């Protein structure tokens, strides 16, 4: 099991849409990563510099490849992923 610290700049005008998709459960049911992505984004924190930060569980190489293609690259820019040991 691998955990990653994710930092990314949210696209401000799309945050409401992302919140709606999270609240509707649409993201949670995405296979195979939906539960982990939902949990990570629900618990993300917005730092004073405008960067969102959260922890994500993932098994892919490269990390978060499926999540990026389906969700993250639509709603965030400058995504940085660091493995947590």
Describe the residue ranges of each PLM region.
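Short S/T/G/P-rich N-terminal loop/turn motif that feeds into the first structured element of a domain
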Residues: 1-52, 57-69
